[in-house]
Amino acid sequence: MTVPTENQEAEKLTNWLRANNYKFTHIANESWLPPRVAMLAAKRKKRMWLSPWFPDYCIILKRGSLLFIELKKQIDYSKSDKGKKVSVTSKEQIEWCESLNNIANTQAEVCNGYEKAKETILYIESI
């Protein structure tokens, strides 16, 4: 079985959030561009202070709090340890999540895959 890409996971999460009437935004701080265009885009993002480490999603939960999700691809357990492709959470991403978790009525989580993100949302909504 092929593990979905991070973009495929993001599409699933976006569709689920829309279908369940959540107010949210996907922070577009990642993209693939040709090298020359990417260099110009990176300079523009830096001038605008767009953090490449900020969580991917900001969701207004139905109970009135905020949830930030850093979405990573699922872990592929079918590969050997040497061949395992894991989407690593950077030190800066962890720092962002820790900072956001210090704000009242706000929670930030790293989720490996759409299913984990959905479970996290439903769990937080239930408490």
Predicted region positions:
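Catalytic phosphate/metal-binding cores of nucleic-acid and nucleotide-processing enzymes, i.e., regions
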Residues: 1-127
